[in-house]
Amino acid sequence: MRSPTQPWSVDIPRLGFSDLTESKMWGISPIDQMLCRIKYRQAYYVGEFTPPTVNKPWIQYPGFNGGSDWGSIAYNPKNGILIANWSNTPMYNQLVARAKADQEGILPMDDPKFSAKKNGSIAAMAESPYAVNVQPFYAPITNVLCNEPPYGVVTAINMNTKKVIWQKPLGTAEHNGP
């Protein structure tokens, strides 16, 4: 479902893969895949613009480490070729009541005493009744992403024809395994 205030360009190829589904959950073993499917069912997910929820985790895809945020794009106006590096990384997020976060000593990121090393993946949100725990969507045992590789891709698009010229995985499985 698309919001009328956040439309996609209709004539330019989209970077990224289609929405996640339970059947697309992946693992390096059948147990991994099963545990990822269970985590998927336990979370709230309605596509790319899934809003945060209070009572259960939600899946953010692409996540904070996903999309074309690592290095952005390169464009050659002479030949109209755009090269984009993008990551395929979903996140598994959970809101935490601010009272609980305060009780555990979790500080907001704008506090001078905040330390990412101390807080890890959880941070209280300034002026909010919540903290948020942000994690990659990993399989519980192996800590491998629950979506199928590749986790990094480079895409070349001819902006004159609005067609993908080529698309290749970027990186190796060596650095993504347990």
Place the predicted regions along the sequence by residue.
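Noncatalytic, solvent-exposed loop/strand surfaces
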Residues: M1-P178
